[in-house]
Amino acid sequence: MASGISRTPATGVTAGGGDDEEAAWLHALELISGFTVSMTLKAAIQLGLIDALTAAADGRALTAGELVAQLPAVDDAEAATSVDRMLRLLASFNVVRCSTEAGPGGDPLRRYSPAPVCRWFTAGDNHQGSLAPRLMLDVDEDNLSTWHQMAAAVVSGGPSAFERAHGMPLFEYMGTNHRFNMLFNQAMSQQSMMVMNKLLDRFHGFDGISVLVDVGGGTGVTLKMIISRYKHITGVNFDLPHVISQAPSLPGVNHVAGNMFESVPKGDAIFLKSMLLRNDEECIKILKNCHYALSDNGKVIVVDIVLPETPKPVPEAQNPLRMDVMMLNNLRGGKIRTEQEYAKLAMDSGFSGSFRTTYIFANFMAIELCK
């Protein structure tokens, strides 16, 4: 390997040394090619690389060759080179860690180990939840194709980009595409598991509730988690008939089929997790039905991502703002809201009592709307 390489920077310029024009150029390139990180991470998960790095004995860092030995590769040498290049990119984004040593021929040999973020991309502990299914959903071809319709949807109004791409709204499409429906449900259930674990640790608004109604509760997994911690609660899992028909029998949970736009079962408290991502008119209709179903001193507990009032270039703002534009793309009238917008929804729906918020995790908040 040549050792006499030298580099002379342009006069007055040091690489990465504060040239504003260069910094803006590199930022532009990052925005253009950011998808390469998501797609490379997807491939790394599909190949089992993240799981293998996380499961390595005694935290040992592995070479690309050692990782490829576990794969059914046709050409191990070629595959090892490809894996090394993939992990090298992920290391530059702090997805994995990289150390370098001298290889057998004197060339650099890179070893990789998991960075902290890998815990959210492994199959791992089923009770923790994983973001791997969420990644697979977001970069799925059925999702990515919809973004090409975003500009047309903005100009034309009416149908969302998703609806323009697939000829029908998101949830209707899920009913026709079993593969995509399974992908969506797995992503949502895994993310919900993570959020609910944090909610049960940090939110104490379930004390004193006798009957808790989970509107849009799916197969009852969320209620099962709540009741395992608050055993005095009787749960009512409320969802559409075709969902309830698949719900298993759960101790302390009564499954009820219906439509939240028509009526909601009565209870001391009503739980709405990720149900108010719709337009204002639909959200107010849901909340008014909840208000009617509550006992005199009852409350609605909303658990959702909350937007910051001001956009800032920090992850705490970027994450909810990305989600908001995903709602714009996928659902007609869909949106993420600020605290003030939730407060207005509550007032417009008849909730005149206290409005309390508890920060949970990763921009999720628990919002209590008291009757």
Curated annotation (Swiss-Prot):
Q: Which family does it belong to?
A: Belongs to the class I-like SAM-binding methyltransferase superfamily. Cation-independent O-methyltransferase family. COMT subfamily.
Which GO terms label this protein's molecular function in UniProt? O-methyltransferase activity; protein dimerization activity; S-adenosylmethionine-dependent methyltransferase activity
Tell me its EC number(s), please: 2.1.1.-
Q: Does the keyword S-adenosyl-L-methionine apply?
A: yes
Q: Provide the binding site for substrate.
A: L137, D138, V139, D140, E141, D142, N143
Organism listed in the record? Oryza sativa subsp. japonica
Q: Which GO terms describe its biological process?
A: biosynthetic process; methylation
Q: Which domain of life is it from?
A: Eukaryota
Q: Which residues bind S-adenosyl-L-methionine?
A: G216, D239, M260, K273
Q: What else is known?
A: Identified in a screen to identify naringenin 7-O-methyltransferase. However, it does not show such activity.
Q: What is this protein called?
A: Probable inactive methyltransferase Os04g0175900
Q: Where is this region: Substrate binding?
A: 170-188
The protein's UniProt keywords, in alphabetical order, are: Methyltransferase, S-adenosyl-L-methionine, Transferase
Keyword Transferase annotated: yes
Going by the record, the broad EC class of this enzyme is transferase
